[in-house]
A protein has these predicted regions:
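Extracytoplasmic/periplasmic membrane-proximal domains and adjacent transmembrane bundles
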Residues: 1-57, 66, 137-139
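Short, charged alpha-helical segments
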Residues: 14, 178, 190-194, 198
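Non-catalytic alpha-helical coupling and interface elements of nucleotide-dependent molecular machines
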Residues: 20-27, 55, 64, 96, ...
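Nucleotide phosphate-binding site architecture
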Residues: 44, 160, 197
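Hydrophobic transmembrane alpha-helices and their membrane-interface caps
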Residues: 60-148, 152-171, 180-184, 188-191
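Interfacial helix-loop-helix hairpins and adjacent transmembrane helices
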Residues: 195-210
């Protein structure tokens, strides 16, 4: 077996891409075989598992959200927010220079859970306000204001907790995904979610907040 480490400033995928062709062109003696093992093999198997089970997990997520809210409009609002988080992730990858490999993908999947939690909390607060007889537009404003502090506190503690990992060779990409993705997703939660709610429910501003 042959093993090597990766110097700081380089990723495993980058190094593997540079040496793979030369290594695989080596003619082996009769009876000898060659295969990639260790971290490369483990990540490949993990990626296959994600590709296999992600559609089922996504379908279950939709079913749970519909059952939770009792309608389709609010789950659709949540699903509209999730892809937009990739904007923050892309910015993070470009600024830090990490590849969007296995660990960043794992970080993004974890990030989706945080986003869903924050959006559910905000939508639930809007629903509570409306059930209490508050005008729809007023309910959106007051719910967003009341949920801003908890959402920001949760996002800030998570982001600060990821900062030390940002400088790690193995987990730096995952940390960058969560830090930049969650920063952008928090803004989506507080600004885009209320706007989508008003659009889906055709709510217009009233004189108090116009």
């Amino acid at each position: 077996a042959a093993m090597c480490g990766v110097k700081p400033g380089h990723t495993m995928a980058e190094v593997h891409g540079e040496i793979r062709k030369e290594i695989e062109e080596i003619e082996l003696p009769e009876g000898y075989t060659f295969f990639w093992d260790a971290q490369y093999k483990d990540q490949g198997e993990a990626m296959q598992a994600i590709a296999k089970f992600f559609p089922l997990a996504f379908l279950m997520l939709i079913v749970i959200l519909v059952a939770l809210f009792g309608n389709f409009r609010q789950p659709i609002i949540i699903l509209c927010i999730l892809p937009l988080s990739l904007i923050g992730v892309a910015v993070g990858m470009l600024l830090t220079g990490f590849d969007f490999g296995f660990f960043p993908i794992a970080g993004w999947l974890g990030l989706l859970g945080m986003i869903i939690k924050n959006v559910i909390v905000l939508l639930d607060e809007i629903n509570i306000q409306r059930r209490n007889g508050i005008a729809p537009y007023t309910a959106i404003i007051e719910a967003t204001v009341s949920r801003t502090r908890p959402v920001l506190m949760a996002a800030t503690t998570t982001i600060l907790g990821m900062v030390p990992l940002l400088f790690d060779i193995a987990f730096g990409g995952m940390a960058a995904t969560i830090i930049f993705g969650l920063t952008f997703a928090t803004l989506l939660t507080l600004f885009v979610t209320p706007a989508l709610y008003a659009m889906f429910y055709k709510i217009k501003s009233n004189s108090k907040y116009a």
